[in-house]
């Protein structure tokens, strides 16, 4: 059966699939669809050795009107998903993520914490969007794109000052299997060819 915790707000016309879990305080707009086994509004539980510190409290997850959450997707508390969005099957959206309106986040995509995604963005199957990435409006992110945020790969304290994800400016297109190294900026309307490594 479906689990709906205390303080959840479901807009008119919402539908919930089998075994969906809606955590406390989560807010869904009108006519949202939540597919089977999706989990909405869960709290992050980092490993004891994690260097990413989670705030002691997070605001509830908010999802706009007519958005769809796929089967097995997990969307954390503290995030905002706009109207008319699609979060694909088996996709993970971490805490403190802001997703604009009319965004497609495809199947099996990971969006890490503190990411900003503008209106009209399309992120295709299997992409990895690392923490602290910004994707401006109307960008296209092809399948299996990988973004990174730590040039030191977990070594030395310098990484804490210098880590940061890519900034992908308005209307840019990033081809399949592209790898973007930390702190890269892709210009407005730029095109990055498939398989490129941008350093």
Regions found by a protein language model. Name each.
Residues 2-199:
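Structural signal for interior beta-strand "rungs" in well-ordered beta-sheet cores
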């Amino acid at each position: 059966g479906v689990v709906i915790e205390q303080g959840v707000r479901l807009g008119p016309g919402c539908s919930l699939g089998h075994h969906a879990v809606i955590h406390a305080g989560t807010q869904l707009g009108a006519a949202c669809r939540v597919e089977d086994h999706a989990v909405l509004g869960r709290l992050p539980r980092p490993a004891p050795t994690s260097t990413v510190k989670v705030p002691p409290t997070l605001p509830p997850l908010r999802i706009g009107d007519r958005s769809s959450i796929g089967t097995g997707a997990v969307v954390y508390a503290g995030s905002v998903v706009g109207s008319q969005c699609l979060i694909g099957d088996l996709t993970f959206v971490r805490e403190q993520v802001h997703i604009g309106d009319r965004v497609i986040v495809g199947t099996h995509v990971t969006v890490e914490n503190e990411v900003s995604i503008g209106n009209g963005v399309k992120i295709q199957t299997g992409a990895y969007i690392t923490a602290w990435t910004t994707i401006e409006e109307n960008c296209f992110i092809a399948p299996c794109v990988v973004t990174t945020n730590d040039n030191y790969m977990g070594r030395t304290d310098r990484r804490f000052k210098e880590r940061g994800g890519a900034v992908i400016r308005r209307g840019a297109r990033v081809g399949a299997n592209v790898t973007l190294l930390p702190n890269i900026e892709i210009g407005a309307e730029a095109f990055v060819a498939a398989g490129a490594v941008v350093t």
